[in-house]
Amino acid sequence: MKLRKRLAALALAALTLLTCLTGCGSAGDDGDRLSLSVRVGDKPATYDPIYAEEIGDQTILNHLYENLMRLEKDENGQITAVSGAAKNVDVKENADGTVTYTFRLRGGKWSDGVEVKAGDFVYAWQRLADPATASVYAPLLSIVSGYEQARASGDMSLLAVSAKNSSTLTVTLDGHYDWFLREVCTSIATMPLRQDVVKRLKEAADAVNEVKPASDSSARWWSDPTMLVTNGPYTAETLTGSTLTLTENANYGKKITGPDELVFHFSDEQTGQILYAQELVDAVWPLSEEEMAARITADETWQADPVLETYAVLFNWSRLEEDGIRRALSLAIDRDAIAALAGITGKPAAGLVPPGVPEGEQDFRTSGGDLIDKTSEGYADRCTQAVRLMQEAGYDRGSDLGTLEYLYADEGTNGAVAEALCRMWRSVLGLNITPRGVTKAELMTALRSGSYTLAGMAVSAVCNDAECFLMDWTSGNSDNLLHYENSAFDTLMSIIAKAEEGSARMGCLHDAEDLLLEIDCALAPLYTAGTAWDLRETYMGGFRDPRGWFDFRGVYLRPVTVQ
């Protein structure tokens, strides 16, 4: 009875939204105009590219702005980087090992008719790199020459990004980093911004805040997306409490082959599923656990899209210096049991780099194989080995180590994972480890300061390349949350940075991951997970970027087959 009432209430909530919903996949009277309705998240937390962390926020910005390059799905279903705001790029290797990219812009315009200039990218990239903005995506630019000096001094002119003239942008990198065009130049966080527009909108927001009650949330320069000046294929036309409508940007300068109108719907996941089932939206993300389970039942070969992160236990090297203890902690983990807590798509981690990261035309994880013994059959033997390692380290009883603490961000399934880990460590090793849930901000503060012993964290990367999952762990790196130091690892990563794309580079990347996990046991990967979405069968052309956000600019009606 309670379930029926809840479903009825959800259905009623969905129907009350109907008055502000456009028709699903509606076409105009002439049949040529296409409106696509999409649900990919809750109400956006921000429309500022350097702060957008949610999939829905990033998806909207992906349609409002255009970067130097953009990703496109080709006829074979492969996602490749093509020209965006730049019409071409020249690459030159310098005598000192640095590499300079020279972009020539195509002469595109902002939505107010003003020309897109190289200086707009300089402003946006300097703003991203500036420690004062505290963007989590600043490391995207860590490969740009002068990045560390700019951040240390606060002088962003030291960042090697400059406008040679209004249509020519130059960027110098510290090494080859062949993923620069594919990953950095297509990222949401490196989208261009007009400094004069940001300044004007900030002043307007400040004026509003002066007369608003203190109890109200502060206005931001991006608070009203319909006031934004953007350079992508769409502009924000109408904002309501539950929808944002984008329409074609008349000044884009390229023909839009997809929808003339995109309507983004903001709702919780359950309501999103109802809207999709009732054909009130054409695309929905994410699919529920129940829906994914049903697909697996119907087709055992069905696979969720990989999420580019690995949940892992971080060991603070300044506190857990003994290799035997770290290795014992990792061996005592039943990864099958932990992965089951992550949901229907959870799988025991085989390494730090998750599935979905490319190695040429192959998958890096598949090519590298399992670096972690995660079989349930071998768990008893691993526990025996873990006990022996503790004894060899001089700890006959786990209690000899005293009481330890395991920190984690108190959200999602992290709490259940923490409790399970601490039970395993107590049962197998006799360790007294107390789990403590904190906010995500508190966790990051502890990790950066080194004031932790054990911590759980989703290890992700700002780019879809194996190097980006490994480069943070070099000695002295400000993002090295393990406080790990190994000169051999540093040397490998230095070689990788200067290597061109190819088998030699990939071999070094596999060696670096092996050194980090198998030889040093610097951290203990636990599990990876997946996600899934739906685009109604009447459509073709949309795709999910491996980094998470979606692209609907190429969606079109599936041709009708006449029999």
Where do the protein language model's features map onto the residues?
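N-terminal lobe/hinge region of extracytoplasmic solute-binding protein
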Residues: 39-94, 229
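Ligand-site clamp/hinge motif
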Residues: 242, 248-294
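Long beta-strand-rich cores associated with HINT superfamily self-processing modules
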Residues: 535-563
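Extracytoplasmic/peripheral linker and loop segments enriched in polar/acidic and small residues
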Residues: 339, 373-379, 432-443, 468-538, ...
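Gly/Pro-rich hinge or "lid" segments in bacterial periplasmic/extracellular proteins
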Residues: 73, 177, 185-257, 261
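Surface-exposed binding/hinge segments that line
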Residues: 120, 138-210
